[in-house]
Swiss-Prot record:
Intracellular or extracellular location(s): Cytoplasm
Helicase C-terminal domain location: 231-393
Catalytic reactions of this protein: ATP + H2O = ADP + phosphate + H(+)
Source species: Xanthomonas oryzae pv. oryzae (strain KACC10331 / KXO85)
Name of the protein in its database record: ATP-dependent RNA helicase RhlB
Compositional bias annotation for Basic residues: 506-515
Role according to the record: DEAD-box RNA helicase involved in RNA degradation. Has RNA-dependent ATPase activity and unwinds double-stranded RNA.
GO biological process: RNA catabolic process
Length: 574
């Protein structure tokens, strides 16, 4: 990025399809950003591109223009069926795929192109029906698309003439590289297919992928004075763990009304921080892997509309999402990866705007700071944690935004969101027949929890009796239960026998599990009546003979004894 995010190059100066130019102008795009001005002269004639540019520089529009212009100006491959896609755009995360699809529809709705958005976490059958009907462009995450290609043969990529890999470095981080190679092998060979690759960093592994599956790609790098956005004002505080929430509330109270994102490292802290902010009167949304996909989309949409003041998220929202007007980004937890820091603060100061990036370096995550400063090649200014900042200012009455009343009635509180998420996850695990929690699941606590703590429901809906571990040589449980009354009655009438007869019954070995005796693994009940115990015999006392006493009573004295007697005889003169 630079202080001048737009160049003097206009989209109309390129040989674009007239309908595409009209769509760009109607969407408000007239001049190119640096990455767009570098990419389009290479991509429009059909060349492969390996582009490096930071987030928020307009990479999405660069490859969307190249894809749509190719599909509008060039005929499809000869062996293409009407339902086969002509272009594939791959993104590492669902949120990024949704954002790309939204931008594509924004200025490409009137071009006659059919778009399909494919990602996990939503209705599988609806996406399959859409693909079977036929589309021109698929915008997808690798996992769900491979499921359609590999397992169900829903879609074929043999006629895909252009492929885009967005955030390629993130693909490696998330372990998608094998999936990417699998999909590229199902497309036309690289001499026929055009491939556009974009990444925040063109590392060795990214370039290796480019040269392996691309046709002599041209490496394009947007030179910047700094890796981070020039208009981001960065500062860092060093609070203790106990001061972080109070400091966050104090800083938020001094920036009332500003659209804010708060990043944390774990899903558990998303819920904890969001609950704290909600208790203090803030309207909060959450983005993490625990939140269902539909709810994530709804919360993100409300945040973009201004119905939510703060969005608390993990790194799932750190890349690719373009949210207008984000003024503050808080790193509540410093990220472990320096690149994640750059992508987090890239949510603000996009396309020439200004913003603030505020980080907390507590004792738990402060060790990441040297790597971050080395990566961005600058020292982050340090601000002191004062008692004034730890005191939140009184909040002014907030003017409600249109649509907030309906959302309040829907009950989209943080607690409700996570409770519904846990219930939905438990229901899905039960529906799949597995899982360690929920009814019938196998949890060690709760009613109906599994073998140890409760019985699962039978075919008639009634709870089954708990099944005891079977011991080797033991009769079946049902037979043993039916014999218990008979055995008890016979035992009462049986004559007494000696203890020796009772001891002749075979002993059953007690099985052990994980070093602990299995509960209920007692010796099996004999099929014959159990004899009543005989009267106890008087115990026999066994007296051990001391060793020295035994030596004294023996006929042969010890060596020391013989020496002693010899000395005494010499002294006495005998």
């Amino acid at each position: 990025m630079s202080d001048k995010p737009l160049t003097d190059v206009t989209f109309s100066s390129f040989d674009l399809h007239p309908a595409l130019v009209a769509g760009l102008e109607s969407a408000g795009f007239t001049r190119c950003t640096p990455i767009q001005a570098l990419t389009l002269p290479v991509a429009l004639p059909g060349g492969d591109v390996a582009g490096q540019a930071q987030t928020g520089t307009g990479k999405t529009l660069a490859f969307l223009v190249a894809v749509m212009n190719r599909l509008l100006n060039r005929p499809a491959l000869a062996d293409r069926k009407p339902e086969d896609p002509r272009a594939l755009i791959l993104a590492p995360t669902r949120e990024l795929a949704i954002q790309i699809h939204k931008d594509a529809v924004k200025f490409g709705a009137d071009l006659g192109l059919r778009f399909a958005l494919v990602y996990g976490g939503v209705d599988y059958d609806k996406q399959r029906e859409l693909l079977q009907q036929g589309v021109d462009v698929i915008i997808a995450t690798p996992g769900r698309l491979i499921d359609y290609v590999k397992q169900h043969k829903v879609v074929s990529l043999h006629a895909c003439e252009i492929c885009v890999l967005d955030e390629a470095d993130r693909m490696f981080d998330l372990g998608f590289i094998k999936d990417i190679r699998f999909l590229l092998r199902r497309m036309p060979e690289r001499g026929t297919r055009q491939t556009l690759l974009f990444s925040a960093t063109l590392s060795h592994r990214v370039l290796e992928l480019a040269y392996e599956h691309m046709n002599e790609p041209e490496k394009l790098v947007v030179e910047t004075e700094t890796i981070t956005a020039a208009r981001v004002r960065q500062r860092i505080y060093f609070p203790s763990d106990d001061e972080k929430q109070t400091l966050l509330l104090g800083l938020l109270s001094r920036s009332e009304g500003a659209r804010t994102m708060v990043f944390v490292n774990t899903k558990a802290f998303v819920e904890r921080v969001a609950r704290t902010l909600e208790r203090h009167g803030y309207r909060v949304g959450v983005l993490s892997g625990d939140v269902p996909q539909k709810k994530r989309e709804s919360l993100l949409n409300r945040f973009q509309k201004g119905q939510l003041e703060i969005l608390v998220a993990t790194d799932v929202a750190a890349r690719g999402l373009h949210i207008d007007g984000v003024k503050y980004v808080y790193n509540y937890d410093l990220p472990f990866d320096a690149e994640d820091y750059v992508h987090r603060i890239g949510r603000t100061a996009r396309l020439g705007e200004e913003g603030d990036a505020i980080s907390f370096a507590c004792e738990r995550y402060a060790m990441s700071l040297p790597d971050i400063e080395a990566y961005i090649e600058q020292k982050i200014p340090v601000e002191p944690v004062t008692s004034e900042l730890l005191t939140p200012l009184p909040r002014a009455a907030r003017v409600p935004v249109e649509g907030e009343e309906a959302d309040d009635e829907a009950g989209d509180s943080v607690g409700t969101i996570f409770r519904e998420a846990r219930e939905q996850r438990a229901a899905e695990e039960q529906r799949r027949g597995g899982g360690r929690s929920g009814p019938g699941g196998g949890s060690r606590s709760g009613s109906g929890g599994g073998r140890r703590d409760g019985a699962s429901a039978g075919a008639d809906g009634k709870p089954r009796p708990r099944r005891k571990p079977r011991v080797e040589g033991e009769a079946p449980a049902a037979a043993a239960q039916t014999e218990k009354p008979v055995v008890a009655a016979a035992a009462a009438q049986a004559p007494s026998v000696g203890m020796a007869d009772a001891e002749r019954a075979p002993r059953k070995r007690r099985r052990r599990r994980n070093g602990r005796p299995v509960e209920g693994a007692e010796p099996a009940v004999a099929s014959t009546p159990i004899a009543a115990p005989a009267a106890p015999r008087k115990p026999t006392q066994v007296v051990a003979t001391p060793v020295r006493a035994a030596n004294k009573s023996s006929g042969s004295p010890s060596l020391l004894g013989r020496i002693g007697r010899r000395l005494r005889s010499l002294v006495s003169g005998n």
